[in-house]
């Protein structure tokens, strides 16, 4: 039997990873393969905001004072060694949806499996919101930063203590998640 050369082995290994990711996406992320309608996104955003207000003390007045909210009700992250995440959401201003967006990010490192999370991005000033809306694909860490907020048990969200123009919250089925970053996530406008 003839040994394969290094480039050939490397090429086969790459395709094994690609096939593995495709199978993983097919098993766990079948529901993300079909883009949601505008109505489906709006209903999911409503539910996500209701859950956010229930899970995070003081969030209702905080959200009411925001200049804009970018909500991704379900962002799926899947990977085998390297992976990615995808979700669809809506930008709301004054309680009304004005645009639809998707989010994508790639990740590398030790990982296997899939998980779902909700992302709520809050624009606290007009300039930050305007800069976001005028961009053609806005990437966290490149086009601007998002301060991911964590709140300890027994404390309430207080906007007077937040000095950042854009803040973000990441939640899973159990509530607010800790030690997460949105660095590298890209938000792009969709036509709906």
Regions found by a protein language model. Give the residues of each.
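Compositionally biased non-globular segments, especially hydrophobic aliphatic-rich helices
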Residues: 10, 25-28, 33
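N-terminal secretory signal peptides that target proteins for export/translocation
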Residues: 1-12
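Bacterial N-terminal signal peptides
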Residues: 15-28
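Small-residue-enriched, tightly packed secondary-structure blocks
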Residues: 34-192
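Helix-centric, low-specificity signal for extended rod-like, repetitive segments
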Residues: 2-3, 21, 32
């Amino acid at each position: 039997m003839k040994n394969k050369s290094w480039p050939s082995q490397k090429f086969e290994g790459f395709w094994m990873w690609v096939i593995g990711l495709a199978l993983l996406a097919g098993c766990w992320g079948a529901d993300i393969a079909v883009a949601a309608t505008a109505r489906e996104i709006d209903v999911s955003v409503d539910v996500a905001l209701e859950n956010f207000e229930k899970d995070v003390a003081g969030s209702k007045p905080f959200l009411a004072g925001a200049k804009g909210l970018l909500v991704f009700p379900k962002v799926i992250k899947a990977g085998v060694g390297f992976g990615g995440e995808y979700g669809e959401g809506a930008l709301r201003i004054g309680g009304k949806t004005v645009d639809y967006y998707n989010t994508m990010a790639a990740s590398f490192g030790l990982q296997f499996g899939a998980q779902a999370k909700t992302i709520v991005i809050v624009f606290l000033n007009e300039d930050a919101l305007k800069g976001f809306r005028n961009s053609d694909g806005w990437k966290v860490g490149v086009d601007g930063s998002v301060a991911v907020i964590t709140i300890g048990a027994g404390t309430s969200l207080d906007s007077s203590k937040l000095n950042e123009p854009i803040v973000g919250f990441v939640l899973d089925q159990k509530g607010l998640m800790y030690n997460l970053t949105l660095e590298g996530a890209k938000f792009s406008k969709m036509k709906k």
